Amino acid sequence: MKKIYIITGANGFLGNNIIRNLEQNSENEIRALVLPTGITKSLENLNCKIYYGDVTQKDTLTTIFENIKDKEVYVIHCAAAVYIKTAYNPSVYDVNVNGTKNIIDKVLETKSKLIYISSVHAITEKLNHELIT
């Protein structure tokens, strides 16, 4: 059975390197999700098809999930917003929580498998700045 890999955050450091690893097996079909405004230079000459979408906009995820019936589909969710400053940034929540929910919904809807890559913003800091273990 043909395997399809859908990589979110495909033009980021991790997503790009995952694609480089997956493309070593020429039987893999690799679908790279990139923001509509994303730079795709790092994906040039890689064995992947680029799809434009935004994990925070569920309707933009439809195309990348098309034509997957009777195929083994793995979604590797690398898309994330990282904001190092201490001030609250609502886009971090929107991408990392709402965007991940949209990906999970599509995975469940299509009976795909999910590999979730977390971010530094998955857990808030403790109030007294203790290390989280």
What are the functions of these language-model segments?
Residues I39-S42, C48, Y52-V95, K106:
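NAD(P)H-binding glycine-rich loop region in Rossmannoid oxidoreductase-like domains
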Residues S26-G38:
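Conserved glycine-rich Rossmann-like NAD(P)H-binding loop of the short-chain dehydrogenase/reductase
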Residues K2, K69-V73, K111:
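Local beta-strand N-terminus motif with an aromatic residue
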Residues N16-I18, S42, T86-A87, E125-L127:
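Short glycine-/acidic-enriched loop or helix-start segments at secondary-structure transitions
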Residues K3-I4, N28-R31, S112-L114:
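Residues at the starts of beta-strands that form the adenosine-phosphate
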Residues A10-G12, G38, A80-I84, S119-A122:
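Active-site proximal helix/loop that lines the substrate pocket
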Residues I4-N25:
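N-terminal Rossmann NAD(P)H-binding glycine-rich loop of SDR-like oxidoreductase domains
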Residues Y74-H77, N98-T133:
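Conserved Rossmann-fold NAD(P)-dependent oxidoreductase catalytic core, especially the SDR/UDP-sugar
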